[in-house]
Amino acid sequence: MTQFPVLSRRLLSLCFIWFAAVGAAQPTEPLTFFVTSDSHYEAIERVERNDRNLITIERMNTLPGEAWPDKLGGGLIGKPRGVLALGDLIDDGDKNGQTDIEWKHFADHFGLDGTDGALKFPVFEGWGNHDGPPEKYIKQRVSVQTEIKRRNQLRLENKLISRVSPNGLHYSWDWNDVHFVQANLYPADKQNAKVRYSLPWHDPQDALTFVKEDLAATVGDSGRPVVIMAHCGFDTDWWVVEDWSEFYRAVKPYNVITYLHGHTGTGVRKWKSEGEEKFLDVVNTGQTEKGFFVVEVSADRLRLAYQVKRDPALLKDVQWEWRYQFEKRISRQAAE
C-alpha cells in the first residue's frame, strides 16, 4: 500500500473538506416556486373574479409534475416551496361591508401554510395599494396590514421565514441557498415628498431600510442569489425615479437574480438606474385570475414562464398555455 507523507495526507484531508464545503453550498436540487399578484378579491361586484382566482389556484395545485416548455429545456416542473402573492390581495382595503368579506375570500383560497386553504403550498403575501392604509388609519374591523403582521408571527413560529422587520410587515427567508426579501408596497422608506398622493395608503413604511439591513446581515459578500419582491415596479408614478435609483444603489453589491412585482400588468423586462451598467431582470407577474409565473433556480440557471389561461373569462373548460418564457445563466458571486 502506498504511504503518503504526513504533509500530503493533511493536504488531501483539506482538499476533501474544501470539496465538501463547496458541494454543501450548491443546491442539490432545483428550487421551484410560483408567483402571482393582484388577486383583487371582491365582495359585492365582479365576484366572478373570485371564482377565476380559484381556478388559477387549482391549476397551481396540479401543475407540478407536468413539463416545462421545450424552449426552456423541458423536464418536469418540481413541487413549489411556496407561492409569492405580490399585493392588491383584495380590491377594497377600507370599505364598509366589503373589506372583511374580501379578506376572508383571500384567506380561504390562499390559506397560510398549505394546509388551511384551497392552495396546497405555503403563501408569502405582501400588501399593495388596494389593500388599505396602516392599521391606525383603518375604519373597518379587518386590516390587511394587521393580518400580515399576525401571519408573519405564525410564519416565524413555523420556521417558514427567518426575519421580520421591527414593524412586523417586511420579511425574509431562505430556500436552498437563495435569499428572498418581501418588501410589500415598494422598497422605499417613505413616500417621496414630491408625490403627495393618498399618503397613508402609499406609505412603504421603512421597507428599504429593512432590505438594506437584511441583505447586509444575511447575504453580505457571499454572492448567493437574491430575489426581491414588492407590489410596484419601475413604472409606477408614485414610486419615483430617484427612489428607484436609491433602491438600485442599495442592492447593487448583491447578486440579485430577479426583481418581482405586480400592479401594472404582465411581462419580463430589463431595467437599470441611469448611468449604471448592470441590468436587473424584472418580472411583472400579472393578475391571479389570468395566471401565474413558474420559477426555477438551479445551480447555474434561472428559468421562468407564465402559465396563463387562453381565455381568462371562462369558468369551465379552461385551457392553459405558456407565455413570457425566459432563462439566464446565474452565478454565485457577488455583483461587485
Ranges and model annotations:
Residues 2-12:
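Bacterial N-terminal signal peptides that target proteins for export
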Residues 10-21:
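Bacterial N-terminal signal peptides
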Residues 24-98:
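N-terminal active-site segment of His-dependent metallophosphoesterases
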Residues 33-35, 83-85, 125, 228, ...:
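Residue-level marker for buried hydrophobic side chains located in beta-strands
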Residues 38, 87-88, 128-129, 231, ...:
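Active-site glycine-centered loops adjacent to acidic/histidine catalytic or metal-binding residues
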Residues 93-210, 246-252, 258, 266-306, ...:
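Extended active-site neighborhood of metal-dependent phosphoesterases/phosphodiesterases
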Residues 215-236:
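Short acidic, glycine-rich surface-loop motifs adjacent to enzyme active sites
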Residues 229-233, 257-267:
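Histidine-centered catalytic micro-motifs
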